[in-house]
Amino acid sequence: MSPAGRPKGEFRWAKPEGTPVTVNPPPLIGPEQVALIARRVSVIVASRDSAHRPHLMRAVGRRVSADLRRVTVFMSASSSAAVLADLRANGLIAVVFSEPSTNRTLQLKGRDAMVAPIEPGDEAVVQTYLLHFIDEIGELGFNESVARTMLCATPGDLLAVHFTPEAAFDQTPGPKAGQALSPVAG
């Protein structure tokens, strides 16, 4: 939230007759990026503490809001303590979605990360993500136990991290790596 109590990224001004008008910028991600996020990707969440020391941990699932403005990643509370502490303290987050079989990679950054309990249906999202990731790395020769070890999280240990992407980058190896993505035209 902004100091004025409005969600970050929301702009207000007064029309001549004094009626407030709210304008939301277009979402930073569009159907192409959502399609990549929905694929069998590896999801890595990064944060930093007040001394600028980085922390990172693998997420165990992900979801994009219907309006494409918010991204949620699911994390194991017990194995992600440092990242979650950073996010609670400063809200700064970077998330990388990378498809192991193709190296297609998207990085999203935000400043408003919020740690929250999971919601009804989130456990199913996490389970589906695990099964898809097992298939993805299975095609690369890794057996199921590798994925289950990497993505180990029990329902009582899951937390959701919600954030608004404020910057997006194509991180797929090649000539466009590091290129910033523009907001999606509405």
Residue ranges and their predicted role:
Residues A38-S76, L106-Q107:
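Short beta-strand segments
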Residues G61-N103:
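A short mixed-secondary-structure module that forms the rim of ligand-binding clefts
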Residues G18-S42:
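Short, basic/aromatic recognition patches
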Residues F11-W13, R104-G186:
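Charged, gly/pro-rich active-site loop segments
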Residues E32-V34, L84, R148-A153:
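A generic local secondary-structure boundary/capping motif
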Residues S2-P27:
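Short, compositionally biased leader-like segments
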